[in-house]
Amino acid sequence: MSFLAAGMVGLQGLGTFMKYSSLKREGQYAMGAAQFDASQAMFAGAQEIINGETRANDRIAQFDSDMESNIALFAFKGRDVDSDASINAFFDKQKNIAYTDTSLMANDGYIKLGQAKLRAKQAMYRGATAKASADYRATSAIINGAFGMAQTWSTFG
C-alpha cells in the first residue's frame, strides 16, 4: 500500500471517529438538557403548589379580617351578632364562599403540578429520542466510515 493510500485511510478513520464522537456527545447533551428541562418543570410545579397554598392562606386571612369588620359594623348598628339569624346566615355564607375559594386555589396548584409533571415527562421523552437518534447516526457514521476506508484501501492499496 502506498503512503498516499495509508494517509487517506488514516484521515478517513480519523474523520469517522470524530463524527462518531461528536454524535455521541450530541446525544449526551440532548439528554442532559432534557433532564434540566424536566427538573425545571418539576420545580415550577412545586412552586405552584406553594403559590396555591399561599393564595388560600391569604384568602382565609382576608375572610377573618372581613368577619371582624362585619361584626364591628353590625354591633355598631345595634344588632346582636350572636342571636340574629340573618346575620349568622350571612356569616355562614361568607365562610362557605371563602373556604370554597381556598379549595379551588389549592386544587389549581395541584392541577398545575400535574401539568408540570407531564412537561417533565415530555422533556425526558424528547431527550431520550434525541439521544437514540444520535446513537443511530453515530453507528451509521462508523459503518459509512468503514465502507469508505475499505473502498480507499481497495482502490489505492
Each language-model region and where it sits:
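Feature marks short, highly hydrophobic, charge-poor N-terminal signal-anchor/signal peptide-like helices
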Residues: 1-6
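Glycine-/small-residue-biased sites that favor an extended, beta-strand-like backbone
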Residues: 7-157
